[in-house]
């Protein structure tokens, strides 16, 4: 897609409204069923002010200009330097696109998501999956 679009591309997935406060959320004009021309990106907005429910899923193709934008940004949400703020700065000078993708994604930034990923992938593992399944079955139920 990068060769065709020649701009930053952010992987996005639809998230439940109550989860917008966990993600960078994008809004813009859909060019196709998967590609959006991004006009706005907001870091962790409350559900009532989120511009959409399309959350950035932590996969990016970025142009070098984002680094200069990050250097110019004050600290954002959580007193952290936010990549989202750098991307928002890019919108003034460059095209930014969102790519809506299908597929399983684990939010390893939360304890619950990390545990989901660990258990599901362990169960699928060719060498330890069968053992892990038996291990889980043998755990005492409290």
Positions of predicted regions on the chain:
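Unchanged
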Residues: 1-121, 126-142
